[in-house]
Amino acid sequence: VQIRREGAGTFLIDPVGIEDRLGPLADVMATDQWILHAADQDLPCLHELNLYPPEVFDTEIAGLLLGFPRISLQSEVAEVLGFGLAKEHSNSDWSERPLAPALLAYAALDVELLLDLRDELTKMLERAGRLEWLREECEEIRLRGPRPPKVQPWRKAARQAGVKDQRSL
């Protein structure tokens, strides 16, 4: 979990193995707007950790509403703030523990510019008359419940063939 708080710095928290001890973090995080990129991808994982935002600002949706040709975080930071983000670790294996120092640095850099990006996107959305649209979209994503379990089509075919489990296929 990557956290950047104005005046407090950047924090990286690996919740693996401490999922049941994140209550104090949840209490602190329940007081501020969360700035996320592609919130609909992050929130389900954060909900599994009992982390719920009181308000969301999704930079990806902001980019869509502003008609940006590319809406990756890297593209938006370059277009709006004029900085290039290194993305050489985006396809790394994040399941290996402990995380390598290079991966930790990469994860921290991902959130370093989110406050500035939010501020500039907010100004742009206000000028375009679309800030309220963003608020509505972000609230819908924030309130969205957990995703239903993925359909596993092999189960239906397996039942018809008398197969009891996936391994028997």
Indicate residue ranges for each PLM-predicted region.
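Conserved RNase H-like, two-metal-ion catalytic cores of nucleic-acid enzymes
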Residues: V1-S75, E79
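Short, flexible segments with low predicted structural confidence
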Residues: E48-L49, L85-A86, R144
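Hydrophobic/aromatic-lined pockets within catalytic cores
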Residues: L51, L66-G67, L81, L85, ...
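Secondary-structure transition/capping residues
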Residues: L73, K87-E88, L125, E132
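A short, charged helix-loop
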Residues: S75-L103
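Mixed-charge, glycine-rich, non-catalytic linkers/tails in nucleic-acid processing enzymes
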Residues: P101-L169
